[in-house]
């Protein structure tokens, strides 16, 4: 993962407080769970070797999202919305909120991927990555627990549904997932304001650190 770009809800906002409280409440269910800041990863593998590189990533991300603001305001829904809760089989997506498809969010990811991951910049490769590999989500639990038993799934479904004030409706899980529940109603996340952060994600999660941040 090395260096990643996160998009975070505004600190002390209702979305931040709700999700952060949920992350805390789920810690007790997984013996190896660790704490982390609520975020959606826009992309990882950034070419970022200096403070100037980090500043350039932030400037591009902010510019890309600000350019969408009139259209976001006109439609009245945020760029980050959640339509499902999933239990995955991998450490970083063990329990997560899946983002609804949003062309503005995907557009920001494509811009950053093209400019700061592809070397040299390659619009076609960035577009292919967005359509084939980009699965934006907000993690609630990181854990190496491979199989989540039915009793724990029931507790997760109840606790997450209560925290979000939504029904979790079972759906057939996609490959790589153990369980999938549709959120009814879908949950609004955030748009602008928000905070982009360039984060060095090396070693244990407790050792990750923010290299630079910019608020929108």
UniProtKB/Swiss-Prot annotation:
One of its GO terms (biological process) is cyclic nucleotide metabolic process. The keyword DNA-binding does not apply. GO terms for cellular component: Golgi apparatus. One of its GO terms (molecular function) is 2',3'-cyclic-nucleotide 3'-phosphodiesterase activity. The active site is at residues 39, 137. SUPFAM superfamilies: LigT-like. It comes from the Eukaryota. It catalyses: a nucleoside 2',3'-cyclic phosphate + H2O = a nucleoside 2'-phosphate + H(+). It is found in: Golgi apparatus. Its EC number is 3.1.4.37. Gene3D superfamilies: Cyclic phosphodiesterase. Keywords: Golgi apparatus, Hydrolase. The keyword Hydrolase applies. Its main location: Golgi. Substrate binds at residues 41, 139, 142. Belongs to the 2H phosphoesterase superfamily. CPD1 family. Involved in the metabolism of ADP-ribose 1',2'-cyclic phosphate which is produced as a consequence of tRNA splicing. This is 2',3'-cyclic-nucleotide 3'-phosphodiesterase. It comes from Eremothecium gossypii (strain ATCC 10895 / CBS 109.51 / FGSC 9923 / NRRL Y-1056). The gene is CPD1.
